[in-house]
Amino acid sequence: MLKTTIIGASGYTGAELALMVEKHPELTLAGLYVSANSSDAGKCISQLHGKLAGVIEMPVLPLTDPLGVAQDSDVIFLATAHEVSHDLAPLFLQQGCQVFDLSGAFRVKGDDFYTQFYGFAHQHSEWLDKAAYGLAEWNEEAIKASQLVAVAGCYTTAAQLAIKPLLVSQLVDTNQWPVINATSGVSGAGRKASMTNSFCEVSLQPYGIFNHRHQPEIVHHLGCDVIFTPHLGNFKRGILATITMKLQDGVTKEQVAHAFAQAYDRKPAVRLKGDVIPRIQDVEFTPFCDLGWKVQGQHIIVISAIDNLLKGASSQAMQCLNIHYGFSPLTALL
């Protein structure tokens, strides 16, 4: 059994991870931690997340001795802020732990990226170079080999799973940039209370126009420019992305369908719906990404639906763990 620890366990993604670890036949939950100054420190996780009552009755402890935690852990999940993961990941890695980081701290190679888009100077370029990008369906070999897996972001997962099959098959005319409009539930902003996310104030609206951090992540890993506009939805969880692309001259509907089928053959977390339009309610509380599409002339619209807390975060992290250790990919996810 792999002794597994979750740092940042009080948040939504941390709670989802705790439940998966508890269900996993090859893992044992070694500890749940939050920052030393967190108001949640010392509380039982079932007190913070009622759905865990009677399932996990373990306190969320303040992280005061990271080295001690490392010595008692085989696997570390970091469900922490970018700067926190940046500081903690190297410590756990140096102690021999396998690390799955759900923040953006190690997703893109290149120190300048973090100064420009995250507002801090990256101090661990050696781990940036070694990190595997955790887009599970597209990076299995690197995930198997790497001690550090930087789990892909929620919007970037929804977008890339929809676009990559067509790019790899050279069916897209990238002179016309793919346009991604994606809407996320408010859980994507975390548990911390704010006016924007309060019940009476939350409203469907775009945000982060031209400057959302996931835009350069998408561009970097796709290898082509995109226009990305995220939206805040007035619902709890899920992401629906609608992506418009121009196809190369002469591309047929059959070629499009073949590209998706070939890309996701034996990839059980991606469900191809063809011309059936995906819905958030069909993927909510599941580890799946549903993809549907329509072709008209030289244009294609692809719709991608995921649960932002699961395929966009926790279940993808666990999927990466399953890949890394050679377990069945959906172990503990269903």
Swiss-Prot record:
GO cellular component terms, semicolon-separated: cytoplasm
Transmembrane spans: none
Superkingdom assignment: Bacteria
Catalytic activity: N-acetyl-L-glutamate 5-semialdehyde + phosphate + NADP(+) = N-acetyl-L-glutamyl 5-phosphate + NADPH + H(+)
Catalytic residues in the record: C154
One GO term of the biological process aspect: L-arginine biosynthetic process
GO molecular function: N-acetyl-gamma-glutamyl-phosphate reductase activity; NAD binding; NADP+ binding
Catalytic class of the enzyme: oxidoreductase
SMART domains: Semialdhyde_dh (SM00859)
UniProt keyword annotations, A-Z: Amino-acid biosynthesis, Arginine biosynthesis, Cytoplasm, NADP, Oxidoreductase
Gene3D superfamilies in alphabetical order: Dihydrodipicolinate Reductase, domain 2, NAD(P)-binding Rossmann-like Domain
Metabolic or biological pathway: Amino-acid biosynthesis; L-arginine biosynthesis; N(2)-acetyl-L-ornithine from L-glutamate: step 3/4
NCBIfam families according to UniProt: argC
Role noted for this protein: Catalyzes the NADPH-dependent reduction of N-acetyl-5-glutamyl phosphate to yield N-acetyl-L-glutamate 5-semialdehyde.
UniProt protein name: N-acetyl-gamma-glutamyl-phosphate reductase
Gene of this entry: argC
